[in-house]
Amino acid sequence: MIAVGPTDLEIYLFHEGSLYKSYELFGAHVIKKNGMVGTRFCVWAPHAREVRLVGSFNEWNGTNFNLMKVSNQGVWMIFIPENLEGHLYKYEITTNDGNVLLKSDPYAFYSELRPHTASIVYNIKGYQWNDQTWRRKKQRKRIYDQPLFIYELHFGSWKKKEDGSFYTYQEMAEELIPYVLEHGFTHIELLPLVEHPFDRSWGYQGIGYYSATSRYGTPHDLMYFIDRCHQAGIGVILDWVPGHFCKDSHGLYMFDGAPAYEYANMQDRENYVWGTANFDLGKPEVRSFLISNALFWMEYFHVDGFRVDAVANMLYWPNSDVLYKNTYAVEFLQKLNETVFAYDPNILMIAEDSTDWPRVTAPTYDGGLGFNYKWNMGWMNDILTYMETPPEHRKYVHNKVTFSLLYAYSENFILPFSHDEVVHGKKSLLSKMPGTYEEKFAQLRLLYGYLLTHPGKKLLFMGGEFGQFDEWKDLEQLDWMLFDFDMHRNMNMYVKELLKCYKRYKPLYELDHSPDGFEWIDVHNAEQSIFSFIRRGKKEDDLLIVVCNFTNKVYHGYKVGVPLFTRYREVINSDAIQFGGFGNINPKPIAAMEGPFHGKPYHIQMTIPPFGISILRPVKKGSVKSFMKTPHPPSHGAS
């Protein structure tokens, strides 16, 4: 006989809210012991009168398949002395008022392909990983002073087959990984991959939190994809939604005829904006379910981080004109972060929070929520508003560029150009830019350069890397035919060069979260809409000079204050001909001149490209004084 029942400690911890590997108890598990084999099913249904197991193994007839109640708070269990791997199943739940519900398993490891909704008995173990080198490397490096440039994508619409069907997890490994490597992104971020019934929810209205969606293959297939990413040196971040869930009848909503996973009070329970239900984050069993879910994806899928969706929806009670703090959510998020960082200190926990909630990325012991990154939605909104302003009027909204530096170090920020900004009629980033065809591309190159040089880690949604004209069409693939056009190929070349520049020069990432890493040179030139600043690395004199021109005027012999008396070499210029520009670059090193300017002891004279950005580095081979007696003339063009 196989001992299959839960221990008293497991039951206690689950109902206390701290059974953080609850997936080892709940769900369907094939158990082999002493030459015997069987399948155990365990589910939490606190309001149920009866629970029966139905499936393909008993012709969906639950007679004689009653689960036994093993805790007074509603844990039910049954053991079937057969190996049921691969079989479909559901729970047939009799509610307190006598209704009968058919429910998928909240802890199922695999689910039927929509529109079907049954759970599948699946052996989640057994995949042989080959990412040991990646995991060792990750343990040695702190991400805060390393490059982090995320490529965000939706698995189902990045690329499709000729017949319109999806690429599988394994096929995407062959298609996507070389593309990401070619561009130089450090991580990919996948829109939610939990099982969800509606394609157009993009995974944000999930039901099967422990099931990798079967749209693209099996859970082991997804493990293969992530394994291949790691072998190629690419990190994988999952978009994760612990705040609310889909209300379809086979799922978590009113699971046993009454609120179990959701708040009991309708005002708190219903998420009217998205048509979903809010998790009851104060309920211990829900905390066990959700925190375990994060650990599950870390343990079995080796994910490198989570982008936690809609944090504001959790932090404040819903459906109110007044922002009331939800203390349950605060406690949940703090415990979540403490638990996952105890499991993996190098995990990325990224909050998507659109509010000014303080100390999101501060440690919990210091009163913070405990994330290590937060999306900088304020920066994103301000810079896009600025770029959409006609160039001749940008001088009147100068503060849209400068304001972000007043709070840039209040949190550890990621600068996101995400899917949210290129859908629902918002237009693509390229289409947001005003002006002619060429001016749109020039301003997008400028915007990407500014993204690269502004303090904070980076994120770009798929399609942005080649300047997609149309906004994201989630039922279609990206507009790959745009690579037939020079301007889009040149834009793509520019993005690749930006990524090379980003990884090559430490001032662009080493001190992202310290005021020591940024210094304005000229922040006051609103009339010409020109900004100049310094990015610094950890080593003294390891710096870059950045000059941005947000108008269509070109300037020759433009004076910029500099801190070092040496030559400066342009490392990238967005107006270079190979990027689709007009060649207003600085092809030769520029010598610093005596005489203070912009509050700096020396200055240079350079060409400032229209709608352009120029990044310069000091040449370290001796000072100007050692080899030059007269000022170097300014550069006036491109070769």
Curated annotation (Swiss-Prot):
Its EC number is 2.4.1.18. One of its GO terms (cellular component) is cytosol. Optimum temperature is about 55 degrees Celsius. SUPFAM superfamilies: (Trans)glycosidases, E set domains, Glycosyl hydrolase domain. One of its GO terms (molecular function) is hydrolase activity, hydrolyzing O-glycosyl compounds. InterPro entries: A-amylase/branching_C (IPR006048), Branching_enzy (IPR037439), GlgB (IPR006407), GlgB_N_E_set_prok (IPR044143), Glyco_hydro_13_cat_dom (IPR006047), Glyco_hydro_13_N (IPR004193), Glyco_hydro_b (IPR013780), Glycoside_hydrolase_SF (IPR017853). It holds the Pfam family Alpha-amylase. It comes from the Bacteria. Pathway: Glycan biosynthesis; glycogen biosynthesis. One of its GO terms (biological process) is glycogen biosynthetic process. The active site is at residues 309, 352. Keywords: Carbohydrate metabolism, Glycogen biosynthesis, Glycogen metabolism, Glycosyltransferase, Transferase. It catalyses: Transfers a segment of a (1->4)-alpha-D-glucan chain to a primary hydroxy group in a similar glucan chain. Catalyzes the formation of the alpha-1,6-glucosidic linkages in glycogen by scission of a 1,4-alpha-linked oligosaccharide from growing alpha-1,4-glucan chains and the subsequent attachment of the oligosaccharide to the alpha-1,6 position. Belongs to the glycosyl hydrolase 13 family. GlgB subfamily. Monomer. This is 1,4-alpha-glucan branching enzyme GlgB. It comes from Geobacillus stearothermophilus.
